[in-house]
A protein has these predicted regions:
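Detector for Asparagine
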Residues: 8-10, 53, 114
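Generic hydrophobic/packing signal
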Residues: 43, 62-64, 107-115, 133-135, ...
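A conserved acidic, glycine/proline-rich C-terminal tail/linker
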Residues: 145-175
Length: 183
């Protein structure tokens, strides 16, 4: 496709666990870029990845939308329509976990593929004070709370409202019915 993940900023991840996956179970992975659309700040890229068991049954599907910024464009906003807040009152959430992000843990999670997650110069060139955690790392923080509930299947979307820098403190808030969460 000629499209690199370098510099991309995750805006949305939809994670579908079709059925329970057993740790160590062999899975086949396939994926595709489903669309590339111009937006005022660059391109909006949609991708889909599937994890199937050896019988070909879908176990997990991941659909993502990301912004590939074009640094020559000067638009303040412009990655497409911004969804309404998923959590209108963050103060109503129960504090489930607290995380202290560190450069070391972020580098350990994202060592290759997109330098804005592990190189200060690349992050600053993209307009960030420091490297940002990868979308997968953010999803990991959210799903850790869900997996402890022993859920066999799920379908949820993660909206990335702002970047999380590799040296920030953050907390995970959960509504009482596990209908929404926020970092």
């Amino acid at each position: 496709s000629g499209i690199s993940a370098e510099g991309n900023i995750n805006m949305l991840t939809q994670l579908i666990q079709h059925q329970k996956v057993v740790l160590g179970e062999p899975l086949e992975v396939s994926g595709e870029i489903t669309s590339v659309d111009p937006v005022p700040r660059g391109h909006r890229i949609s991708t889909s990845v599937w994890f199937r068991n050896i019988s070909g049954e879908a176990m997990i599907s991941v659909h993502r939308v990301s912004l590939k910024p074009d640094l020559s464009l000067k638009a303040e906003r412009g990655a497409g329509d911004r969804p309404e807040p998923v959590v209108p009152d963050v103060g109503a959430l129960r504090r489930a976990r607290t995380y202290q992000l560190t450069p070391e843990s972020t580098k350990a999670y994202s060592r290759e593929g997109n330098a804005i997650h592990y190189e200060l110069e690349a992050a600053q060139k993209a307009g960030f004070r420091a490297p940002i955690i990868g979308g997968g790392q953010g999803v990991h923080f959210l799903t850790a709370e869900i997996w402890e509930q022993g859920i066999a299947s799920l379908d949820f979307s993660v909206y990335f409202r702002r970047p999380l820098l590799w040296d920030q403190s953050l907390w995970l808030g959960v509504d009482p019915h596990l209908q929404s969460m926020a970092l």
